Amino acid sequence: MAWGWWRRWRRWPARRWRRRRRRRPLRRRRAGRPARRYRRRRTVRTRRRRWGRRRYRRGWRRRTYVRKGRHRKKKKRLILRQWQPATRRRCTITGYLPIVFCGHTKGNKNYALHSDDYTPQGQPFGGALSTTSFSLKVLFDQHQRGLNKWSFPNDQLDLARYRGCKFIFYRTKQTDWIGQYDISEPYKLDKYSCPNYHPGNLIKAKHKFLIPSYDTNPRGRQKIIVKIPPPDLFVDKWYTQEDLCSVNLVSLAVSAASFLHPFGSPQTDNPCYTFQVLKEFYYQAIGFSATDESRNYVFNVLYEENSYWESNITPFYVINVKKGSNTXDYMSPXISDSHFRNKVNTNYNWYTYNAKSHKNDLHXLRRAYFKQLTTEGPQQTSSEKGYASQWTTPTTDAYEYHLGMFSTIFLAPDRPVPRFPCAYQDVTYNPLMDKGVGNHVWFQYNTKADTQLIVTGGSCKAHIEDIPLWAAFYGYSDFIESELGPFVDAETVGLICVICPYTKPPMYNKTNPMMGYVFYDRNFGDGKWIDGRGKIEPYWQVRWRPEMLFQETVMADIVQTGPFSYKDELKNSTLVAKYKFYFTWGGNMMFQQTIKNPCKTDGRPTDSDRHPRGIQVADPEQMGPRWVFHSFDWRRGYLSEGAIKRLHEKPLDYESYFTQPKRPRIFPPTEAAEGEFREPEKGSYSEEERSQASAEEQATEETVLLLKRRLREQRKLEQQLQFLTREMFKTQAGLHINPMLLSQR
């Protein structure tokens, strides 16, 4: 061959060096297992190219040679040692819980806040939204109710370690669900939390889980599994159960939704909603603190406008009204039919009633109604012929039921002649047109005279702005109830005001942009109670005025107009969840042996069946190192004197079984109510209790009582200093917990 000499003597160009591939050492096999025998690699038939393998012949390529690489000096391994208790036991807390229970007409309520309510049978229960927060204290409370089981007792090991949890949601037949979990602080509800949990906003969230119904997705898995790691700020180390008890482990927000009909129910032909709003002349005298001049102005408008009396109920409340104590006598003054009613035809735009000329008689008749309900009633006269219920008599008759400012004569929505002017206006809301910008929603007490929005000062509570109404009203009434606390009846102490320029007509006044509008439901306008019954108690007949109690239905209907909202067409919808929380108990266990006489029994008949092992679960708050026996407490077969003295100081917890919490434990705290209504620490005390008595009190108080008071203050101060010292020692030892995780404490 002509080029043979070149191939014999010419060396090929040197290959480009590359690092030699390091061989992994063979994994050490488990002892006792035979080595896996070699199997010939299975051949795979491949399609060959028609013209053979493509080769790059243009130019020449260097041939690569393998050169032994130079390895960097390996750094020394750092061995991190963590202290472990002598005894460690894994514990799985498994339980079932109705995360959401929504009765009919409760579509805008929060079930977590009402989960412990005693609702009478026949009335709806719960809500479509549930915001729950889980901690070791909540799990123990669920165990006391028989809703979970613990795989290993916690009464012998005082240390704990949290390793995460898992929730299993079971799909329902007709209702869809959407949820979101949170493991970041703060675990609190603010005024914008519930609007963000509306299905229309939650469907757009990045981190969420969907639970479709069988009607939406007939196929698929029967359950949705959600695995949740420990909190972000939680340091994985050993804590005492006493410290870990109040740590928030996870917060869940689950809401009922509708994936099949996101923008309207098939039972309706219109996505809009119409409700009634008071006219603007009411808003200067809406509260108790309004002046007599402003109230008289409202009565002058109502009693001088004949069109406002065009109602079917007018003759029953005005003409020839008889007394309640004696139906044979007429109230004074007696207004006859011939004087008050005109003989005209309303088809020709004539007013039926002549109220303007009987203005003074109407005022006197309203006062007569008020006397029949208060001073002349059985509750004041203590008559044996009637039921004497005791309640405080109002100071004004402006809110009388029959002829007061908010009588059904003026506010009934179904008018016999709709074209006549009335004391309210019909407002229509289209959720698709609500941009949110310029909307204002707030709650104010009945003591506020007008409906002017005051951002600073605290007179307007839970002020929400720039949010669509279908999201702002979601869980809003329950948030107000949690803000005001468990000792305030939020439904009867105030009302909700709204500013919304996206309704028709707009609930917005250009000349007075900060004036709020008050809406009410149909039952209040018809003079009925919230459940539709027409019998009104005398207590409410002298207090007939707009309250948040009479605004719940309107808020629920507006919430249903939002996208993906729950349509509330079923008797109830329930979402059941199974949870598993993984803990590890640790400590220095003292093994106790219970030895019985094998030759004698306790008198009960023997049973060949195997009984389940009883798990003793103790309150985690009572499982600190101070209240548990350890192996080092034994000295020569006996407990040491210090251990016995330490256990004698343990408080008894029998009373905690009968006392109910002020709010459900699974309900997370709110920002305003956290410091005011949370459960007090043991040994904590308020500023009023620590304050010293004034000089006048010391002069009148006896010396013995004063010394006892000083001694009580000193003991409380001692407990507080002991708590502060104990927390300081925990911080120095690295056993403290991030305070941001203790919002429920």
UniProtKB/Swiss-Prot annotation:
Name of the molecule in the record: Capsid protein
Domain of life: Viruses
InterPro entries: TTvirus_Unk
Function: Self assemble to form an icosahedral capsid.
Disordered: annotated span: 23-44, 598-619, 660-700
Subcellular locations according to the entry: Virion
Keywords in alphabetical order: Capsid protein, T=1 icosahedral capsid protein, Virion
GO cellular component: T=1 icosahedral viral capsid
